[in-house]
Structures are given as C-alpha cells and as structure tokens.
Amino acid sequence: MTGRNKAHPFCLWMLSAALGVLSMAVRAEGMRLPLPSPGLMPNPAAGKVLYEQSCASCHGADLKGSDKGPPFLHRVYEPSHHANLAFQLAVKNGVRAHHWQFGDMKPVSGLTPDDVAHITAYVRAEQRRAGIR
C-alpha cells in the first residue's frame, strides 16, 4: 500500500458493524430513528436561534458549558466521537451521564429532527471555528 492507512478498511468494517447493531437494537425496541426531512439543508443561523432557546441554559451561550451541562466546544463532541445522529438521539431520548458529572440529560420536548439538524449545523460550525474537526 502506498501511503494509505492500513487501519482504514478495519475502521469501515467496525463502523458498519456498529451501525448494524444499532439498527437491530432500534428495531427490537420498536423505535424510529429521529432523522431530519429528506433534502433538508441545515442552516447554522437558524440553529443558533434554536440553540439559544433550547440548549444554551445548560450548554452555555458560548457553547463552553455551564454548571448544568458540558461544553460542545470540546474534543469529546468532535464529529468522529459524537456523530450528528448522537445529537438527534440525545434530544429525543435523553442521555445517561457518561463523560461528565452533570447528571443525566432529559429528553428535550418541542424540537423536531429538523430543528436538531439546524442546531447541530450551528454547533459544528462553531466547533470548526474553534479548531475542532
């Protein structure tokens, strides 16, 4: 192999296996994945407004966290560790505390999958600005 990462095929296989397991778990639970509308172009500006209304009180107006919730401007939330679907699932189902000591996150009512896609686009844009890729 010339300059290619030999782990790449293994990583793709692991990702595929993980998605397969997730898919089976979702079917077993009778849940539907919260997905944005087909063709939606997530808008960071719209996401900023929604973030300020629904997320900033815990995750900080500056995305740097608060005494109630963790920062999104942190490597833990980079796309390779928390994919965009993780944001959708967190809003829909809540999250058990696993990286931080803030306690469990409850589901967030009143946000659609499209809203969450806009919020995620805003968070990702701010992460890129902060050098988190």
Task: Show the residue positions of the predicted features.
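Post-cleavage N-terminal segment of exported redox proteins
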Residues: 1-42, 90, 122-133
